[in-house]
């Protein structure tokens, strides 16, 4: 079976998924003011944090060429696991841009440290946008990935849904997941 052709899910599963997704959107929307408050607090506490707040809203500083790879590594551990993957992708696809997203400042710092000579040379870093439709859509429209690779099991519902809707295959790398859990995605 190819990556793009997937068996159709039963209607009951689709309905449950739709309800769960809708509840997630409502809950996330209610919590959005807290996320913005946290951003503001962190930017006051660490002024350098303010310089990259826009990335959490889906706005990237440097737009890579369309059709590249989006690889997400949450924090330090995932970044350490991702660097060999990034280097292997670079060898296999030397001209394809790779956008690496992280969620934490420590993950960002570790990525910058480990790929210091390669960042900017068709490898880009951005903070991952908050998992809300507008922010993820903005990010996807700017980065225009041909594939989304997630390190471990950092699967965000809106991101996965919008990737699927835009025809961007989602690959989970270096993860442990039961067959039952995998069916939910």
Protein language model regions, located:
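Compositionally biased, low-hydrophobicity segments enriched in charged and small polar residues
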Residues: 1-9, 159, 171-173
């Amino acid at each position: 079976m190819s990556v793009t052709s997937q068996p159709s899910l039963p209607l009951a599963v689709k309905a449950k998924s739709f309800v769960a997704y809708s509840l997630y959107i409502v809950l996330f929307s209610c919590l959005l003011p807290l996320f913005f408050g946290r951003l503001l607090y962190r930017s006051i506490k660490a002024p350098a944090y303010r310089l990259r707040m826009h990335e959490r809203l889906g706005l990237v500083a440097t737009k890579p060429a369309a059709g590249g790879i989006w690889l997400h590594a949450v924090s330090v551990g995932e970044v350490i696991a991702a660097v060999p993957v990034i280097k292997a992708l670079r060898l296999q696809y030397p001209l394809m841009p790779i956008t690496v997203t992280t969620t934490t400042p420590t993950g960002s710092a570790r990525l910058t440290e480990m790929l210091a000579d390669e960042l900017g040379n068709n490898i880009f870093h951005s903070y991952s946008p908050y998992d809300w439709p507008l922010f993820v859509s903005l990010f996807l429209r700017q980065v225009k990935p041909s594939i989304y690779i997630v390190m471990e099991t950092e699967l965000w519902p809106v991101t996965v849904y919008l990737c699927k809707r835009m025809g961007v295959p989602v690959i989970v790398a270096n993860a442990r997941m039961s067959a039952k859990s995998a069916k939910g995605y």
